[in-house]
Structure formats: structure tokens, C-alpha cells
């Protein structure tokens, strides 16, 4: 019987993901997240101030053709708006025709606009200048080249300025706004006055072009430019004054924002959602070593590169402009308790996260400095940014460090984590929380505790909304759906499913867990995505939950019905060994008995899904279409577990696989092409199926040649796993015990020389396991007396079948 499927190993979290990164829906962004079209100036720091940012002096001369086009557009807009205005009942404007004459010189200062209007003098309403405040958009169609503006790129390895922000990205100047490429959540023009980042030192560049405005004007567009020398002189004077002011501010309060781009915090890095980054750590089938979710790990886990030697600095004592010496872990842990400075706490948590990335010494220091309880306290803060920073740091701290995992448990950290997972709605934070739980679940001493406490919250908070099983029922739950969160949660449950009988019982009894997992797998098959990254975890969960299900699951209504067996038909055995079976032989009489058939239940509930016909078909589909080695192995292993028990359910499933679904055709392909591990599981499944005599004809007809071909030759140097050889010998024993015709089929496939060769193998203390199984098989073959003459004709003697080695092996097997 197959052991439970192994669990995933842990993975650390640097600034990126499976610590998880995805951009939350822009529709959820608050008003402060939206972009303004202009920048604040030296003395205007009001939240709603969006005054005009004027261009540089050397950019004031624009092309005549472009200027004429802009003015003509404005005039046409004015005329069209005036024509659309309603006419009063008692007085109306006459049909007015306006003609525009535009003359221009080489300078914008001599630009003139002449208008002639024909107006009904009885009208009491006077025409006014264009009211730009009523334009459909406050933004110009295109910013002219030379206009400096902040642009925060979402691809910069730093913190974006949303509600989940932690550090500032680099802010290069751009020639114009690229509105189709700039997500609103990442764009802010009022960043320099945002008090949330007063204590942070980030890699930010001040635009090279100074920004200035006229505080007395209400202009929001750049259409009307100064047209006289007096106005241009006044503008030059204001520009010079503003340059001096900004230079002073840069020497003071803003200097902390001008670090090199090479200085970066190990903070969140947004990544594309759903498309899985190639290369993950395998499930290590056959090993009981846990696997933890590791973000940014080296090797086969998905990873985004980060700068490991980035110099991280903090402002000291809250004084703007002062940079402290290089931060130490002790200082960072102490800063976690500064409740009056949230930005400093976030920065300290990010520094700890950075240091603990691939640094075992840093993790040990955090334990001795009592940093874990302080981070757990920060997780209870109302700030999402602080929660994210604390969870991300804790995730790295516990990676591959069992002492830190136990410290989280001893500090009552698990209730804090699960409570935050239940109430938090931020996708980034939920990714970190599920990744943290995955890492914690890899410690064997925590699995039982986590099985009791975490299975139900993970099912309700993650599996239900992310699997799609509740789609259309609750729109709020759909907002929580995220593939990385689901992947982390199923990784945690995969570990917990190998905790033992008690853990398996909790998971089987958890309402909705099995339904969600199966619903998700069936969805990926229907969408032609059987190699989805979370599907492997889901199949491994079911693999472990199916282990010894017949013994561990309370008796329920049997899902089988008695079905009369069809008349047994002998398989043709072309070759030198031919035998005729009497009509009233024991094997034919036995073939007339009834056998259990798996009922087609369209709506299983809970644990019934484990042995449902729908689920069995699902596993066969995965075997056929999946290219993920571990998904395929887990699918075969689950069928092996389901057919391994001695009850009616296992017998019914075996008949369903062979006779109803034609599953042996898939097994045959595995025997021909599979790797060693898949081959081992496949022959184990066939061994379970070979226990039922009514299925022997199908086995002999479809897969016997492949089984014999796998047996090692005496002259073949290829190393054959001994377990595979032993299992094939047991299959042949089951076949030969039931029927002399099966024995003829085995010999006609050329198996006898191989079996005799295997039986002679010795390890120095006696026959090997494979040798013992081959000896029992030879003894079984000789029991068919009607074949003795055929054996002699083929050149074999009785001593080839019955000798001291075979007799000793048979006696040992009986004991």
C-alpha cells in the first residue's frame, strides 16, 4: 500500500513572491490613488492644490503650425458649445456667424486672434470667454516636450504608491504622460508632501526641470501662454526665485529622497499574476521531508532577482535629511517598538526581511533579539502596509528554521495569523499570510497543531473563494480570489495531509475542503490546463486523504451494487504452450459469481468524493493529459490507494477502472514510457487489480507483454529497481495461481528464462527479495501438472522449478 504523498518544502520570501505580488484592481483604489496632471510647488502643499506647472523658458517657442492647430480647436469648441446652449423663450440669439482671422509672427508674443460676431441686439445675454472648467477633461490632449513630470513605473523594484506601499520607486522625468501605460495606482504627483513617507529613505529622483506656478491663477491647461515681454520677464523672475527655493529644500528636507537607484529596500515587487513562473521545487515523492513555500529561493522555485548587497538606511531620530550609519539587526528590532512612527516600523521590518533572505545567521539573531513577538504585535496593527511588512519578515524568519517556527507557536502567533487571514482583504497581505502558513506547516511538530487550528480557516477564507466553487453566489468572495493565495494554501494543506491519521481525519471531515479541491482540478482539466501549478498540490492532497480510507473512514452507505459477471472467456495463447480448460472447471464456476459495481452518483457529498466515479474518471484524465510528472504520479498513486483495500469499494473501483473506463490502456502507455517512479506506482496499481480473477483476462490481453518486457534479463546491465521486479513477480503469481491458461500466456511471452535467472540472485546471505519472489513464482508455475509435459518438451526440468531455494522461499512466504 502506498505511503501518504510527501509534502512541499518551504520557501523564503525576499521582496517578491511566492511571497506574492499582484496589483489589486484599480477600481478599488481610493481617491488619493488617482493621478493629477500637475505638480505642487515650493509653497503650495495643500492636498487639493493642482495649479498649473509652467514650462521652461527654452521651451516657450513652439511650432506655429502646432499653435494654430491648438487655437483653432479651442475656437471651434467654443462656437459649438455656444450653438448648443438653449434659447430663452422671451429672448433668443439670432443665427450668428463668426469668422476667425488668425495672424502669427515668428514669436508667440505677437500672436493675435480676431473675431467678428453678428449678434441679435435684442438678446439680453452676453457672450463670455470659454469656461475651461466645464471642459469634459481637465487634462490637455498632449503634454508638450520639456514638461517635467513624475512617473512611477510599476516595474521598478521598489514600493508602489498605493494603499499597500512601503518604499518609493525611482522617479525619472518623462517628456509626456503615457496614460495608456501608466496605471493610476502607481502614479502620484503629490508624493513629496505625503507624510506617510517622512521617515523613509528611498531611491527617488527629483525632476531635473524645476516646477513652479502662479498661486493666483486658476489655470489648469497650457493653452494660453504669456504673449508680452512684461509677462515673460515676470515669469523668468518667478522661475529664478523658485529654483533657489527648491535648491535649499533639496539641501535640507528632500536630500533623503535623492539616493542612488542602486539603493533599494527588499520590499514588495509586483509580478504578473496567474501565469506561473517556470521552475518549481518538485514534491519529492517518496520522501517524508516537508517542503516550505520559498519566495525568491535559489534553485527551482520561482524567483525574481533582487540586489543582495543593497545598503539600507533610515532617517535617524526623525530628523529630515540625516542618514544613519548602516542599519543593524539590533537597531531594526528596537525600531519595531516605535509606535509613534509607523514609517520607521515598516522600514525596520523590511530591513529584517532583507537580512533574513538566505541568511541563517540573521534568523538566529532575530530569535535571540526577541524580534518574533514584536513582529506578531505589528501584525495586529490596523495599517495594511505595516501588516504586510511584518508578515513578509516573519515568513523569511521561519524559513528552514524550526526553532523560529516553534517560537511563533509559543508566542501564540498562530491565532494572530489566522485572525488576520480571516479579516484582511488585501491580496498582497493574504499572499504573505498563506506563504507563512505553508512554511510553518513543514515542521512535523507543528502539523498536528495546525491541522486542528488552520484547516477550517484555510478552507473558508481561501479554498472556497479561490477554487471558484462559489462563483456567482457571493460577489464579495470573488474579490478575494487569487491563484497565488490558492497555491500557497494548498501547499500548506498538502503538508498537513501527511500529518497522520488524526490530521487526515480532520481534513476529511472539514466541510467543503474535498469539494473545493476536486472542483478546482476538474476546472483545470476542462480549461486544458492540467499542469496548473496548484493542481499538483490538490491531487497530492487527495492522494494522502485516500491513504487507508477503507480503514479510517467511518462506515457509510455502500456506493456499490452487485452486478452479474459476464461469462469468463479464455485469452488465446499462441505459442508452444496450449491448454484446454474443462467447461466445469473451478475457475469458470467462480467466474459466474456476482461482483460489485461502482454506482454513478451525480452529487457526492464530503468524503464520498474520494471514491466517486466522477473522481476516478478525473484521475484517469490527468494520467492521460498531464505532463506534470508529480501530478501524474499522484493521480496513479491515488488509484493505487483506492484499490488497495479489501472491501467492496476497492473491488468496485478496480472493475470500474478496467472494464468501464478502459484504464489499462493508460497504464500500458506508462509501462512503455514512464520514468522509474511512475513505473513503480503503475505496477503497484496492477498488483492491486490482479487480485480479482475476473480482471485477469484484461490484464493478460493488454499489459502482460509490457510487464514481461520490464523484467531484467541475465545479460542486461541496466539496473532495474528491485521493488519493480518484486511487484511484477507478485502480479505473475496472482495470474498463474488463478488459471493454467494465464500460465501458458506468461511462458509464451518468454518470461521463464528471466524468472529462473532472477531466482538465482543472491546477496551473500541468501536470495534477494526479487530472488525470493521469483522462487515462489517458479513453484507456482509447476503446480499446473497439465503443463509438465510441455515444460519437458521445451527443455526444462523439474529441478528448475522445485529445488531447495524455491522450497525455502515458499516456506518463508507462508510464515
Swiss-Prot record:
UniProtKB keywords: Cell adhesion, Cell junction, Cytoplasm, Nucleus, Repeat
Composition-biased stretches (Polar residues): 13-25
Compositional bias of kind Basic and acidic residues: 1-12
Pfam families, alphabetized: Arm (PF00514)
Gene knockout outcome: Morpholino knockdown results in a range of cardiac phenotype severity from mild to severely affected. Defects include slight to severe cardiac edema, blood pooling on the yolk, abnormal ventricles, heartstring and failure of cardiac looping. Heart rate is decreased at 48 hours post-fertilization (48 hpf) from 138 beats per minute (bpm) to 110 (bpm), this decrease persists at 72 hpf. Non-cardiac effects include kinked tail and disruption to the borders of anterior neural structures.
Biological process terms in GO annotation: cell-cell adhesion; desmosome organization; heart development; heart looping; intermediate filament bundle assembly; protein localization to plasma membrane
A GO term from the CC aspect: cytoplasm
Mapped ARM repeat ranges: 317-357, 360-399, 402-442, 457-498, 501-547, 604-644, 652-691, 693-737, 740-783
Compartments it resides in: Nucleus; Cell junction, Desmosome; Cell junction; Cytoplasm
Gene3D superfamilies attached to this UniProt entry: Leucine-rich Repeat Variant
Disordered as annotated region, ranges: 1-31, 76-105
InterPro entries, alphabetized: ARM-like (IPR011989), ARM-type_fold (IPR016024), Armadillo (IPR000225), Plakophilin/d_Catenin (IPR028435)
Secreted keyword on record: no
Function statement: Required for development of the heart, potentially via cell-cell adhesion and modulation of expression of cardiac precursor genes. Plays a role in desmosome cell-cell junctions and their intracellular connectivity.
Designated name of the protein: Plakophilin-2
Species: Danio rerio (Zebrafish)
Amino acid at each position: 500500500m502506498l505511503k501518504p504523498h510527501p509534502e512541499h518544502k518551504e520557501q523564503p520570501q525576499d521582496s517578491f513572491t511566492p511571497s506574492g505580488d499582484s496589483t489589486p484592481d484599480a477600481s478599488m483604489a481610493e481617491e488619493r490613488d488617482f493621478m493629477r496632471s500637475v505638480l505642487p510647488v515650493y509653497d503650495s502643499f495643500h492636498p487639493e492644490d493642482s495649479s498649473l506647472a509652467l514650462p521652461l523658458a527654452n521651451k516657450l517657442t513652439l511650432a506655429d503650425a502646432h499653435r494654430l492647430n491648438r487655437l483653432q480647436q479651442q475656437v471651434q469648441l467654443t462656437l459649438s458649445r455656444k450653438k448648443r446652449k438653449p434659447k430663452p423663450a422671451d429672448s433668443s440669439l439670432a443665427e450668428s456667424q463668426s469668422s476667425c482671422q488668425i495672424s502669427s509672427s515668428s514669436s508667440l508674443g505677437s500672436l493675435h486672434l480676431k473675431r467678428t460676431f453678428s449678434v441679435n441686439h435684442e438678446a439680453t445675454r452676453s457672450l463670455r470667454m470659454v469656461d475651461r472648467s466645464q471642459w469634459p477633461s481637465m487634462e490637455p490632449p498632449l503634454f508638450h516636450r520639456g514638461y517635467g513630470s513624475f512617473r512611477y513605473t510599476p516595474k521598478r523594484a521598489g514600493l508602489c504608491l498605493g494603499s499597500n506601499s512601503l518604499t518609493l520607486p525611482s522617479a525619472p522625468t518623462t517628456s509626456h504622460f503615457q496614460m495608456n501605460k501608466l496605471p493610476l495606482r502607481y502614479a502620484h504627483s503629490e508624493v513629496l508632501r505625503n507624510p506617510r513617507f517622512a521617515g523613509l529613505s528611498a531611491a527617488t529622483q527629483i525632476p531635473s526641470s524645476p516646477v513652479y506656478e502662479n498661486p493666483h491663477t486658476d489655470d489648469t491647461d497650457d493653452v494660453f501662454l504669456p504673449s508680452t515681454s512684461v509677462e515673460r520677464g515676470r515669469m523668468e523672475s518667478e522661475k529664478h526665485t523658485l529654483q533657489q527655493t527648491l535648491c535649499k529644500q533639496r539641501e535640507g528636507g528632500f536630500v533623503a529622497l535623492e539616493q542612488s537607484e542602486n539603493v533599494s529596500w527588499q520590499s514588495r515587487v509586483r509580478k504578473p499574476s496567474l501565469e506561473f513562473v517556470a521552475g518549481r521545487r518538485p514534491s519529492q515523492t517518496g520522501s517524508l521531508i516537508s517542503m516550505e513555500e520559498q519566495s525568491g529561493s535559489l534553485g527551482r522555485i520561482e524567483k525574481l532577482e533582487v540586489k543582495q548587497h543593497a545598503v539600507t538606511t533610515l532617517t535617524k531620530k526623525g530628523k529630515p535629511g540625516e542618514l544613519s550609519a548602516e542599519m543593524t539587526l539590533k537597531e531594526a528590532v528596537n525600531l519595531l517598538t516605535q509606535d509613534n512612527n509607523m514609517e520607521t516600523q515598516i522600514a525596520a521590518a523590511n530591513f529584517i526581511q532583507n537580512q533574513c533572505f538566505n541568511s541563517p545567521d540573521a534568523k538566529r539573531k532575530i530569535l535571540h533579539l526577541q524580534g518574533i513577538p514584536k513582529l506578531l504585535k505589528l501584525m495586529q496593527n490596523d495599517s495594511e502596509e505595516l501588516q504586510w511588512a511584518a508578515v513578509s519578515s516573519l515568513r523569511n524568519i521561519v524559513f528552514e528554521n524550526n526553532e523560529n517556527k516553534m517560537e511563533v507557536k509559543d508566542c501564540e502567533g498562530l491565532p494572530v495569523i489566522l485572525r488576520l487571514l480571516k479579516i484582511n482583504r488585501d491580496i498582497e497581505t493574504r499572499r504573505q499570510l498563506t506563504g507563512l502558513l505553508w512554511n510553518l506547516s513543514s515542521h512535523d511538530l507543528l502539523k498536528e497543531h495546525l491541522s486542528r487550528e488552520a484547516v477550517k480557516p484555510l478552507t473558508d477564507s481561501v479554498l472556497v473563494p479561490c477554487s471558484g466553487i462559489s462563483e456567482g453566489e457571493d460577489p464579495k468572495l470573488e474579490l478575494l480570489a487569487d491563484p497565488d493565495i490558492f497555491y500557497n494554501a494548498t501547499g500548506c494543506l498538502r503538508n498537513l495531509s501527511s500529518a497522520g491519521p488524526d490530521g487526515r481525519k480532520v481534513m476529511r471531515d472539514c466541510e467543503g475542503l474535498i469539494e473545493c479541491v476536486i472542483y478546482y482540478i476538474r476546472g483545470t482539466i476542462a480549461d486544458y490546463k492540467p499542469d496548473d501549478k496548484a493542481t499538483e498540490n490538490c491531487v497530492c492532497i487527495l492522494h494522502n486523504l485516500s491513504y487507508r480510507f477503507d480503514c479510517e473512514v467511518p462506515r457509510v452507505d455502500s456506493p456499490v451494487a452487485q452486478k452479474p459477471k459476464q461469462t469468463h472467456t479464455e485469452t488465446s495463447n499462441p505459442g508452444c504452450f496450449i491448454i484446454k480448460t474443462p467447461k466445469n472447471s473451478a475457475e469458470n464456476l467462480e467466474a459466474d459469481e456476482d461482483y460489485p459495481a461502482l454506482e454513478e452518483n451525480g452529487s457526492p457529498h464530503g468524503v464520498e468524493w474520494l471514491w466517486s466515479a466522477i473522481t476516478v474518471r478525473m484521475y484517469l484524465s490527468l494520467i492521460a493529459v498531464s505532463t506534470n510528472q508529480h501530478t501524474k504520479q499522484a493521480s496513479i498513486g491515488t488509484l493505487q490507494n483506492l484499490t488497495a483495500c479489501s472491501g467492496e469499494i476497492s473491488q468496485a473501483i478496480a472493475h470500474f477502472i478496467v472494464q468501464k473506463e478502459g484504464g489499462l490502456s493508460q497504464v500500458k502507455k506508462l509501462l512503455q514510457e514512464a520514468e522509474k517512479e511512475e513505473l513503480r506506482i503503475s505496477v503497484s496499481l496492477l498488483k492491486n487489480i490482479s487480485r480479482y480473477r475476473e480482471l485477469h483476462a484484461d490484464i493478460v490481453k493488454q499489459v502482460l507483454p509490457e510487464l514481461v518486457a520490464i523484467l531484467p534479463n541475465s545479460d542486461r546491465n541496466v539496473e532495474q529497481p528491485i521493488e519493480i521486479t518484486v511487484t511484477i513477480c507478485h502480479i505473475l503469481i496472482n495470474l498463474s495461481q488463478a488459471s493454467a491458461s494465464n500460465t501458458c500466456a506468461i511462458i509464451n511471452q518468454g518470461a521463464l528464462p528471466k524468472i529462473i535467472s532472477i531466482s538465482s540472485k543472491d546477496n551473500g546471505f541468501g536470495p534477494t527479495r526479487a530472488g525470493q519472489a521469483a522462487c515462489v513464482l517458479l513453484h507456482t508455475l509447476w503446480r499446473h501438472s497439465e503443463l509438465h509435459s510441455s515444460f519437458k518438451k521445451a527443455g526444462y526440468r523439474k529441478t528448475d522449478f522445485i529445488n531447495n531455494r524455491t522450497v525455502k522461499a515458499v516456506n518463508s512466504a507462508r510464515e
